[in-house]
Amino acid sequence: MPRSLKKGPFIEFKLEKRILDMNSKGERKVVKTWSRSSMISPDFVGHTVAVHNGKTHVPVYVTENMVGHKLGEFAPTRLYRGHAGGKAEKGGSAPRKK
């Protein structure tokens, strides 16, 4: 269920303050954050935000297409390594001993 329009989007106060300070100074530094639930605003475009995925901080370069999405959508938390088991030989199973 989306957030109520009367409340407005959630953006962590410190994160928004850092981005606005960097915009006024013209800086482009990586901003480290744990706030995966923060909405990406148009002020974030062009900045790199390091979003925590539970283990490390994943650098996310913000583009115009990302505005309105949440930061956590671009930092996957699960790593798929494939299903268990090795490669099967052609021709069936190994020969049986009698």
Swiss-Prot record:
Pfam families: Ribosomal_S19. GO terms for cellular component: cytoplasm; small ribosomal subunit. Coiled coil: none annotated. GO terms for molecular function: rRNA binding; structural constituent of ribosome. NCBIfam families: rpsS_bact (TIGR01050). This is Small ribosomal subunit protein uS19. Keywords: Ribonucleoprotein, Ribosomal protein, RNA-binding, rRNA-binding. It comes from the Bacteria. GO terms for biological process: ribosomal small subunit assembly; translation. Protein S19 forms a complex with S13 that binds strongly to the 16S ribosomal RNA. Belongs to the universal ribosomal protein uS19 family. HAMAP family: Ribosomal_uS19. PROSITE patterns: RIBOSOMAL_S19 (PS00323).
